[in-house]
């Protein structure tokens, strides 16, 4: 199907290790085909929502009659969807489900369609108490939105994005260190090199 499969650009030894060693099973071994995930929010708890990072398929998301073709999933792969929501009430019980995840897929070489449902509990946590993985994912989402000059970022700055990434990144992880470098390069490209304080020359 259109869009299935994987590709990679190997420009250094670290990228080759990532693709050919760390992610080998994800790249070469598919465990499911035509995978689609739908998320249904509980209208009693969620007043408005916005899916972040799906701008190229915005029409398909807003049109309930449209069909989004699923894709294949490799062994050990994972995916993360980030939503911005406005709640319908100030506080909700932790026992209430805020949404329902509906997963549709087919096993490889099997035409039968399988369905799985997963309730999403209301387990809100302040940002400073989130796991570092989620903080880093937030920084990456903000980074992409900043590149597109998104109106939803408000007063977010490159420095704020960098600070979140620096506090949550694993410094022994090459890819996460490379991400920190990308933020600095993007900041310089968008805003120009930062001026360093120096001594002023005395006028004669």
PLM-predicted stretches and their roles:
Residues 1-108:
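Acidic, polar loop-rich interaction surfaces within structured domains
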């Amino acid at each position: 199907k259109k869009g299935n499969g994987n590709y990679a650009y190997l420009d250094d030894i670290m990228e080759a290790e990532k693709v050919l060693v760390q992610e080998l099973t994800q790249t070469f071994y598919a465990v499911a085909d035509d995978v689609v995930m739908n998320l249904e929010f509980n209208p009693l708890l969620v007043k408005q929502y916005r899916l972040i990072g799906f701008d190229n398929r915005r029409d398909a998301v807003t049109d309930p009659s449209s069909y989004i073709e699923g894709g294949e999933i490799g062994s050990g792969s994972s995916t993360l969807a980030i939503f911005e929501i406005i709640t319908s009430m100030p506080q909700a019980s932790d026992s209430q489900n805020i949404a329902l995840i509906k997963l549709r897929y087919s096993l490889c070489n099997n035409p039968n369609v399988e369905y799985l449902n997963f309730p999403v509990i209301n387990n809100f946590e302040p940002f400073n108490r989130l796991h570092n993985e989620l903080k880093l994912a937030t920084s990456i989402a903000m980074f992409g939105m900043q590149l597109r000059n998104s109106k939803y970022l408000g007063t977010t700055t490159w420095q704020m994005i960098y600070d979140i990434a620096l506090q949550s990144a694993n410094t022994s992880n090459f890819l996460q260190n490379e991400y920190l470098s990308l933020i600095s390069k993007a900041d310089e490209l968008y805003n120009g090199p930062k001026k360093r304080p120096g001594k002023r020359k005395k006028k004669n």
